[in-house]
Structures are given as structure tokens and as C-alpha cells.
């Protein structure tokens, strides 16, 4: 049964009760450092593998990842250096291999264990594209190794490592931008064309397709943004649009990023957006990692009551 506040907002949108430990991980067996958010209570917990946006770092998402982890999930956020999108996907695959080898166990608090059978992947901006690319490589379950990684075409790869991805979420994903570092495109512009077998949630922002200050290119241009990622996802898939917010409004306060920000004069705050995204993650995880779909169903049916901000539209495609 869904738990709600007195005003009807679901408790998934509030910080959970779990005490979270933040762990910086550097290892010769890793292709890059990690920022890990771990519950501290004894037990086994699902894993979120989260990829940051272009020119950002996991520290920019601390509030969001703390929110998610406080509901008893382990969040693993690689710290990518400045690299091409193709190299970023390759690095993400190496981190996934590290997880599948159960090496995360050694860095977690005592008696805290990762449930490698319950893994979700996600990311923001170009990190969202990286998450989709990883799921397209591993999510099809093709033991022969057929995968779609960065070009939008099916290519034969080596046998994939045994990492089961159970859920995929994109926060304002961007497939291709003005930078040469984001030159490849996984989109095919065919509905339901992504070759994956995992449930998908796409969270978009309504202002991310606009020019910043009337001069700078949009952060998430039409045709390569959240709408097209959702359009190409196979059911079950979900779409949530935070229409009054911009591409970087979910970052922690103090992040100085050029781009369109939220509309002024609205009662909603950036903190409310972070709460909303965190709550959507938690509800989606409950549904597809733990088999408890009540929260997600109620949010979809009554977003105006259950959510801290206006989500419009909210779309659910089950089959």
C-alpha cells in the first residue's frame, strides 16, 4: 500500500529513513573512480549505476543520489574524465564488468551487500544516452553478443558479461549535441526500435529544447532529446515531463551551468524537482526491482496529487 503525507504527496518523494554512507572508490581494477552511496543497515540492496552529464561530475547529483539511496538502494556513480561519447560507453561497460565480478562488495560497509540480480542503469544528459547504450548492449539477453551501442546499428560484439539489467531510466537524455565529444547517435527514429527487454522510464524537462539567452544552442534539441528516447523505447515504458524546468535544474545548488533554467515566478523550486526525480526513481525501482507497483500506479493515475511539481504529460505504455 502506498504511503502518503497528509497533503497526499507520496512518501517516495521524501528522503527515506536509511542512513547513507558516501564512499569514494579508486582502484587499479577500475577504469575510473567511483562515488558510491550505500545504506548502512545490514542487508542486501539493489544497485543503481548512474552516469553524470557532459562536463559534470557525480558530486553535482549528491542530493538526488542521497535521496534514492536513503530508500535502501546502492547508487554507484562513475567519475568520467572528458572523453568522447564512444569512449564513455566503453568505460561504462568496464564498470559494469567490475560490478558483475562482485568487486563492489569489498568497498561497502560491513554486512552490506549488493544484489547483483537487481541492477538499474540511469544517467542525465549524455549520461542518459550512455545508460541507454549500456542497456542496449546488455539488456537484450543475446548470448551471441548482438548489441546496439553507439551508432544506432546492430553490430556483432564479443559475448557479453553476466550483468542483468532490470530497469533503465533517463533524466533528460541527449543523443547528440553540438560538441564533437557527443558525435555518435543511438537513435534510429523508428518507434519502439530499441533492442532491449527492460522497463524504461524517461524524465524530460520542458525548457531544455530552448536556446539559452537567445544565443547558445539548446541543451537538449528536439529530435535527439527525451521525447525521441521515449518514442523508441519498447513497453513497458513511462514518460514524465517536468514542463517548467530546464536541463540542469536537478543539479545541486551552486552548480554554475549555462543553459535555460526554470521559469521565474513559479512556486516550484529546484529542490522540488530533485525530490520529484528521486521519488520517481524510488517508485519505479519498487515496481520493477521489488515487484511493488502500487506507488508507481498511483503516481501515474494522480500526478497532480502525488507529486511535488507539475508533470505534464505523464504517459504509461504497458504493452
Language model features: what each stretch is:
Residues 1-43:
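N-terminal cap/lid segment of alpha/beta-hydrolase-fold proteins
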Residues 41-43, 69-70, 112-115, 121-126, ...:
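Extracellular/periplasmic catalytic domains that process cell-envelope and extracellular macromolecules
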Residues 44-53:
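Short beta-strand element of the alpha/beta-hydrolase
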Residues 56-78:
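Short amphipathic alpha-helix adjacent to the substrate-entry channel of hydrolases
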Residues 74, 79-83, 174, 245:
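Short beta-to-alpha linker loops that shape the active-site pocket of alpha/beta-hydrolase fold enzymes
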Residues 86-130, 137-142:
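Gly/Ser-rich "nucleophile elbow"/oxyanion-hole loop immediately N-terminal to the catalytic nucleophile
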Residues 144-247:
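The feature captures the conserved acid-bearing segment of alpha/beta-hydrolase catalytic domains
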Residues 234, 243-248, 252-319:
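Alpha/beta-hydrolase-fold serine-hydrolase catalytic core, especially in secreted/extracellular enzymes
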Amino acid at each position: 500500500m502506498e504511503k502518503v503525507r497528509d497533503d497526499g504527496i507520496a512518501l517516495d518523494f521524501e528522503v527515506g529513513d536509511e542512513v547513507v554512507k558516501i564512499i569514494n572508490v579508486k582502484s587499479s581494477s577500475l577504469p575510473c573512480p567511483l562515488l558510491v552511496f550505500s545504506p548502512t543497515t545490514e542487508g542486501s540492496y539493489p544497485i543503481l549505476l548512474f552516469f553524470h552529464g557532459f562536463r559534470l561530475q557525480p558530486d553535482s547529483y549528491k542530493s538526488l543520489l542521497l535521496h534514492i539511496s536513503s530508500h535502501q538502494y546502492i547508487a554507484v556513480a562513475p567519475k568520467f574524465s572528458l572523453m568522447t561519447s564512444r569512449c564513455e560507453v566503453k568505460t561504462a561497460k568496464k564498470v559494469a564488468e567490475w560490478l558483475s565480478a562482485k568487486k563492489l562488495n569489498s568497498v561497502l560497509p560491513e554486512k552490506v551487500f549488493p544484489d547483483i540480480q537487481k541492477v538499474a542503469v540511469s544517467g542525465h544528459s549524455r549520461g542518459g544516452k550512455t545508460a541507454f547504450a549500456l542497456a542496449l548492449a546488455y539488456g537484450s539477453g543475446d548470448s551471441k553478443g548482438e548489441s546496439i551501442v553507439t551508432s544506432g546499428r546492430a553490430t556483432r560484439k564479443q559475448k557479453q558479461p553476466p550483468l542483468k539489467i532490470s530497469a533503465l531510466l533517463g533524466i533528460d537524455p541527449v543523443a547528440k549535441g553540438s560538441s564533437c565529444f557527443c558525435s555518435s547517435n543511438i537513435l534510429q527514429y523508428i518507434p519502439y526500435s530499441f533492442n532491449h527487454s527492460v522497463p524504461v522510464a524517461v524524465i524530460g524537462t520542458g525548457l531544455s529544447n530552448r536556446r539559452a539567452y537567445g544565443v547558445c544552442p539548446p541543451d537538449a534539441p528536439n529530435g535527439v532529446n527525451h521525447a525521441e528516447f521515449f518514442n523508441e523505447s519498447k513497453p513497458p515504458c513511462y514518460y514524465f515531463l517536468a514542463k517548467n524546468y530546464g536541463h540542469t535544474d536537478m543539479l545541486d545548488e551552486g552548480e554554475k551551468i549555462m543553459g535555460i533554467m526554470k521559469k521565474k515566478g513559479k512556486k516550484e523550486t529546484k529542490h522540488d524537482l530533485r525530490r520529484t526525480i528521486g521519488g520517481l526513481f524510488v517508485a519505479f525501482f519498487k515496481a520493477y526491482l521489488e515487484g511493488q507497483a502500487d506507488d508507481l500506479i498511483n503516481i501515474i493515475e494522480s500526478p497532480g496529487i502525488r507529486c511535488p511539481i507539475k508533470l505534464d504529460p505523464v504517459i504509461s505504455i504497458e504493452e
